[in-house]
Swiss-Prot record:
It comes from the Eukaryota. Residues 75-81 are annotated as: Complementarity-determining-2. Its main location: secreted. Residues 21-43 are annotated as: Framework-1. Keywords: Adaptive immunity, Cell membrane, Disulfide bond, Immunity, Immunoglobulin, Immunoglobulin domain, Membrane, Secreted, Signal. Disulfide bonds join C43-C113. It comes from Homo sapiens. Residues 60-74 are annotated as: Framework-2. This is Immunoglobulin kappa variable 2-29. It is found in: Secreted; Cell membrane.
Length: 120
């Protein structure tokens, strides 16, 4: 498992003057969900995140109030240790989705998608 060394920015990683400029765009920017209902967040990359090693380096993090970001999903769809199975990731190339099958109160926070294919 390849984990990024650092989390850079909220929705965007930008390397000025580089041919590897990648813009990550999440939608929606905010979401109100009733507990027990499903939720979905989309993430679009300006470039394919498929690496020559065959893996796609897309990560999802959750930052709960007053806490550091915690890894939920790595390589598009693999749940990190201890992450409940109500969280799932899908997608390929440039389009990705994080789904929560049944939202719980503890799921409140800021969700981030992050690419790990081009790091400074």
């Amino acid at each position: 498992m390849r984990l990024p060394a650092q989390l850079l920015g909220l929705l965007m990683l930008w390397i000025p003057g580089s041919s590897a400029d990648i813009v990550m765009t999440q939608t929606p920017l905010s979401l109100s969900v009733t507990p027990g209902q499903p939720a979905s967040i989309s993430c679009k990359s300006s470039q394919s995140l498929l690496h020559s090693d065959g893996k796609t380096y897309l990560y999802w993090y959750l930052q709960k109030p007053g806490q550091s970001p915690q890894l939920l999903i790595y390589e598009v769809s693999s749940r990190f240790s201890g992450v409940p199975d109500r969280f799932s990731g899908s997608g390929s190339g440039t389009d990705f989705t994080l789904k929560i099958s049944r939202v719980e109160a503890e799921d409140v926070g800021v969700y981030y998608c992050m690419q790990g294919i081009h790091l400074p």
